[in-house]
């Protein structure tokens, strides 16, 4: 929402993007801008076209950014931390808006980049977990939350407060250590310096991304043997 230029009117910023990508007249771009503001729930869009960003609340500016992103009808909307700096109520409204717009555009998809696992659980169908610039786990959202395979994913989920945890006096478990510098990553597994189940090979050999079950992949030397053992398969054969 800080991407809006504070010295230009909202309508000009939406129209400019449309004119940069499509061969249409300024009037057509203006009319589409009004329609996009209406689509994202901005009241009285014809009037608000002439307002400046400082005249909008944080949530309304986020809606304007979504309108700009969707104005040329893209097949993929990339939303990078779409709820950052918004209060919980406005976060819910923005997520509901994005889901609603996605449902109305059956041929479109939304890629959400976020650290907020509540946002992931609420909006996503499929999840890619990344650490150190590498994909560590891929799974359908329910599968990921119910059966996380990678130690990093498990650490993320264990650090989330849950209802009823206080009754069992269960402490939150933070991931130990610090995130390594992207300029000096470990040679082997990128998570090995913080992993509670690390073995020797993790320091020197980066594990491949392996499909463990249909649609569920993980990058860990221990995951496949552990899963096979838990499934009743003799890994020594």
Residue positions per predicted region:
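ABC-type ATPase nucleotide-binding domains, specifically the catalytic core motifs of the NBD
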Residues: 2-4, 12-28, 38-42, 55, ...
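Conserved ABC ATPase signature
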Residues: 51-56, 60
């Amino acid at each position: 929402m800080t991407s809006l230029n504070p010295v230009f009117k909202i309508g000009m910023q939406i129209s400019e993007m449309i004119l940069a990508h499509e061969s249409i007249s300024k009037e057509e771009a203006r009319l589409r801008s009004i329609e996009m503001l209406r689509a994202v729930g901005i009241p009285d869009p014809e009037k608000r076209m002439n307002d400046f960003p400082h005249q909008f609340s944080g949530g309304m500016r986020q809606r304007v950014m979504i309108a700009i992103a969707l104005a040329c009808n893209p097949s993929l909307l990339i939303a990078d931390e779409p709820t950052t700096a918004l209060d919980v109520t406005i976060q819910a409204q923005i997520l509901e808006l994005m889901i609603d717009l996605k449902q109305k555009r059956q041929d479109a998809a939304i890629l959400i980049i976020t650290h907020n696992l509540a946002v992931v659980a609420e909006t996503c169908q499929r999840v890619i977990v990344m650490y150190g610039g590498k994909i560590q786990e891929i799974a359908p959202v329910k599968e990921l939350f119910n059966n996380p395979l990678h130690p990093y994913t498990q650490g993320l989920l264990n650090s989330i407060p849950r209802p009823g945890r206080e009754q069992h006096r269960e402490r939150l478990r933070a991931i130990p250590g610090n995130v390594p510098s992207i300029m000096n990553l470990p040679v082997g597994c990128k998570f090995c310096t913080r992993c509670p189940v690390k073995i020797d090979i993790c320091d020197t050999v980066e594990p491949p991304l392996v499909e463990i079950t249909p649609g569920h992949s993980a990058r860990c030397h221990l995951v496949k043997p552990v899963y096979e053992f838990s499934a009743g398969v003799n890994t020594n054969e």
